[in-house]
Regions:
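C-terminal substrate/ligand-recognition segments
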Residues: 313, 317
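Beta-rich carbohydrate-recognition and catalytic domains
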Residues: 1-134, 142-188, 192-242, 251-305, ...
Length: 352
């Protein structure tokens, strides 16, 4: 496996203790998978912040949003025979699944792309309504014709789907509800229309026939989506054998639309790879990396809340046109940064 990422020497850039909890009595357990954008001359991250109550001995407790958008705390005895708690992220109690944390989205910004702080007078984004009672996660940001499109994972006991909000000033948001129903996530909208049409990558999942594959859809307005095509599947015996999912908005190059994506194997190791779509018809994938371009190797990527993970859904293409700076979640606990050469990634692609 070839790792071509140039990690920031300052990593991790953000840790759970760098940001205060949203509510008294909660603690931040994880900072994850930021969306990335530029605004007012600064680099901004919209970070997923996962919180839970401070834990008591022999008790598992976790927060849930009510339909009236208040937080309620559920407590379960660890010895309860109806509790299944084999995964740090999800538990099952009396046949129902619950997340062990509640996530919202927090804005931070930086003048240098390395040192981030919370600006004043910019709101956090939180779950709203019955489709987001378990929170909102993993926001991707696309800037299209002066408007920012925010796609994120909406989670509730109804399932996991894709929500959309739009903004021009990051203080006022228009809510468009759930644009892709359960079970779906990893939605990345292209930052340019192709032949007058919006396109987006997304990842529906099937528990029976099919799998965790990357699909593409089109839209006349960026809100209502259809014309779905499955374009990237898992590969048996390789690093992305269990699941694949889109990263951030595809990068336009002379050779095609370049997408940096995540893949995981049966051991739940998450790495990054890349594939290339046709410039005029992105439903056609024309090349893909065989090996990953980034593998969890640093200590902060291997050890954490859920270790052995690198996961990105945000990047910036630098002015030189070749350097792409990604911001990524490491071991489901830290926010980090790394740089790639677009030309080097393109050189590793194999035609399909």
């Amino acid at each position: 496996m070839k790792d071509i990422a140039k990690r920031f020497a300052e990593n991790p850039l953000l840790s759970p203790n760098n940001i205060p909890p949203s509510t008294e009595g909660l603690e931040i357990t994880c900072l994850l998978n930021p969306g990335v954008f530029q605004f007012k001359g600064k680099t901004w991250l919209i970070v997923r912040v996962a919180e839970r109550p401070k834990q008591k001995d022999n008790i598992i407790s976790f927060p849930v949003l009510t339909e009236t958008e208040n937080i309620t705390i559920i407590e379960i005895d660890k010895n309860d025979p109806e509790l299944i708690a084999d995964d740090a992220r999800v538990i099952n109690y009396k046949g129902n699944d619950y997340l062990t944390t509640l996530s919202h989205l927090r804005l931070v910004c930086s003048d240098d792309g390395t040192n981030f702080y919370e600006p004043e007078d910019y709101p956090s984004l939180v779950g709203e309504g019955i489709l987001e009672t378990f929170g909102i996660e993993d926001c991707r940001v696309a800037l299209i014709e002066g408007k920012y499109f925010l796609t994120f994972t909406s989670v509730s006991d109804n399932g996991v789907g894709v929500g959309l909000r739009t903004t021009t000033d990051w203080k006022n948001f228009e809510k468009h509800g759930m644009i892709l129903p359960a079970h779906n996530k990893d939605c990345a909208i292209f930052e340019e229309k192709i032949n007058g049409v919006f396109y987006a990558l997304h990842r529906p999942s099937s528990v029976d026939i099919g799998g965790n594959y990357i699909w593409i859809a089109s839209s006349p307005d960026g809100i209502h989506w259809g014309n779905h095509h499955c374009i990237v599947k898992t590969r048996k015996g390789l690093w992305d054998s269990k699941r694949v999912g889109a990263g951030a908005a595809p990068i336009k190059t002379a050779k095609g639309w370049l997408e940096i994506y995540h893949g995981a194997n049966e051991n739940h190791q998450y790495c990054l790879g890349a594939f290339l779509m046709d410039l005029n018809d992105p439903t056609k994938v024309i090349a893909r990396t065989e090996a990953p371009i980034m593998v969890p190797t640093a200590e902060y990527e291997i050890s954490g809340f859920f270790g052995n993970v690198v996961f990105t859904n945000g990047h910036i293409v630098e002015p030189d046109g070749d350097t792409v700076t990604i911001y990524y979640g490491a071991s489901d606990e830290f926010v980090c940064g790394a740089k790639f050469s677009i030309n080097e990634i393109l050189s590793l692609l194999k035609e399909i």
